[in-house]
Swiss-Prot record:
Source lineage: Eukaryota, Viridiplantae, Streptophyta, Embryophyta, Tracheophyta
Protein name, per record: Pathogenesis-related protein R minor form
Pfam family, one: Thaumatin
Family statement drawn from the similarity comment of this UniProt entry: Belongs to the thaumatin family.
Leader sequence segment: 1-25
InterPro entries attached to this UniProt entry: Osmotin/thaumatin-like_sf (IPR037176), Thaumatin (IPR001938), Thaumatin_CS (IPR017949)
Other comment: PR proteins are acid-soluble, protease-resistant proteins which accumulate in the intercellular spaces of many plants as a result of the hypersensitive reaction to a pathogen. PR-R exists as two isoforms in tobacco, a major and a minor form.
Domain of life of the native organism: Eukaryota
Length: 226
């Protein structure tokens, strides 16, 4: 997501303390409606095993940027919380301290920047689990990506448990936009994702149709397999 990665750090410093003082943390309710277990992950926030029907709530401070929530599949962890996941693995830890390994469907957000939240669903790291990302108290739109992407995934992007974004596999500017703003556009492979999930980012500079805003103070709900 281009905005969240490029939001100036000095602006974060200027506005962060002010909004921490006047705005409460946002609550994110994470719900697993899949028929299988999902190991939810959040940065910031950590991680939690969610069996079918279970939920987990986290509070995120205002001023937080470059944040994301995702689901991991087919995980095995020992009693100390060390192990691995087939998709979305975060350095073999149950309690994530960084981002997950593609492919993983992402709910991304930046809070109070400076007078609105920026939110999106991103497939820039690929797709593994259907997702809905919505406000719990109104004021902005629900975002969904629920198409059967894993089943329809192009052969060159298909991987165990998910569907890679072309940037993960091909790693050129055409797909990764590594040469800066305006250096890339949609491709046939990114259009595969966009046609099935029009709300979601399909490549790194897919900003205008994919980045949404909500009022500051909004609480959110992320649902796996809505």
């Amino acid at each position: 997501m281009n905005f969240l990665k490029s939001f100036p750090f000095y602006a974060f410093l200027c506005f962060g303390q002010y909004f921490v003082a006047v705005t409460h943390a946002a609550t994110f309710d994470i719900v697993n409606q899949c028929t299988y277990t999902v190991w939810a992950a959040a940065s910031p926030g950590g991680g939690r095993q969610l069996n079918s029907g279970q939920s987990w709530s986290i509070n995120v401070n205002p001023g937080t940027v470059q944040a994301r929530i995702w689901g991991r599949t087919n995980c095995n962890f020992d009693g100390s919380g060390r192990g691995n996941c087939e998709t979305g693995d975060c350095n073999g830890m149950l309690e994530c301290q960084g981002y997950g390994k593609p492919p993983n469907t992402l709910a991304e957000f930046a809070l109070n920047q400076p007078n609105q939240d920026f939110v999106d669903i991103s497939l820039v790291d690929g797709f593994n689990i259907p997702m809905e990302f919505s406000p719990t108290n109104g004021g902005c739109r629900n975002l969904r990506c629920t198409a059967p992407i894993n089943e329809q995934c192009p052969a060159q992007l298909k991987t165990q448990g998910g569907c890679n974004n072309p940037c993960t596999v091909i790693k050129t500017n055409e797909f990764c936009c590594t040469n800066g703003p305006g250096s890339c556009g949609p491709t046939d492979l990114s259009r595969f994702f966009k046609a099935r999930c029009p709300d979601a980012y399909s490549y790194p500079q897919d900003d205008p149709p994919s980045l949404f805003t909500c009022p500051p103070g909004t609480n959110y709900r992320v649902v796996f397999c809505p």
